[in-house]
Amino acid sequence: MGFRRLSFPTDFIFLFPNHICLPALSKPYQRREISSWLARWFPKDPAKPVVAQKTPIRLELVAGKTYRWCVCGRSKNQPFCDGSHFFQRTGLSPLKFKAQETRTVALCTCKATQRPPYCDGTHKSEQVQKAEVGSPL
């Protein structure tokens, strides 16, 4: 009677699928990667954000209020999320932020900003100006 030597950790997963906490892999990102069989067999890269508009939207944010800025660019309620990312299966999710003080700000709608959710002037670049509204950069 002989035992087959396991080539750890992949054989361990198939022999004992209910054990997701492997001692050799104690970091959370590794545990999630191993336990998610769906992601392993059906990988899905997130879609690229699309240009919603080529100019920012200026509005007043109220202190203490939480906002959800649309990252995917598909929302009909720009610059805020309306859940379109979920129904179109983009793999993206909104950026949740809380206003620290009441003030007027420019929120990005080209989705190319380096300081989300705030506009940094990237919409003036040639790449954004050449892109069509509704197309990815």
Swiss-Prot record:
InterPro entries linked: CISD, FeS-contain_CDGSH-typ, MitoNEET_CISD
Sequence positions bearing N6-succinyllysine: K65, K124
Main location as per UniProt: mitochondrion
Modified residues (N6-acetyllysine): K65, K96, K124
Cofactor note: Binds 2 [2Fe-2S] clusters per subunit.
TM annotation in the entry: none
GO molecular function term, any single one: metal ion binding
Cofactor(s), names only, from the UniProt record: [2Fe-2S] cluster
Binding site for [2Fe-2S] cluster 1: C70, C72, C81, H85
Entry keyword annotation includes Secreted: no
UniProt: [2Fe-2S] cluster 2 binding residues: C108, C110, C119, H123
Cellular component aspect of the GO annotation: mitochondrion
One example of a Gene Ontology biological process annotation: protein maturation
Top-rank taxon, per record: Eukaryota
Subcellular location: Mitochondrion
Pfam families: zf-CDGSH
Coiled coil: none
Keywords: 2Fe-2S, Acetylation, Iron, Iron-sulfur, Metal-binding, Mitochondrion, Transit peptide
SUBUNIT field: Monomer.
Homology family: Belongs to the CISD protein family.
Summary of the function given for this chain in its UniProt record: Can transfer its iron-sulfur clusters to the apoferrodoxins FDX1 and FDX2. Contributes to mitochondrial iron homeostasis and in maintaining normal levels of free iron and reactive oxygen species, and thereby contributes to normal mitochondrial function.
Protein name: CDGSH iron-sulfur domain-containing protein 3, mitochondrial
Upper classification of the organism: Eukaryota, Metazoa, Chordata, Craniata, Vertebrata
Gene: Cisd3
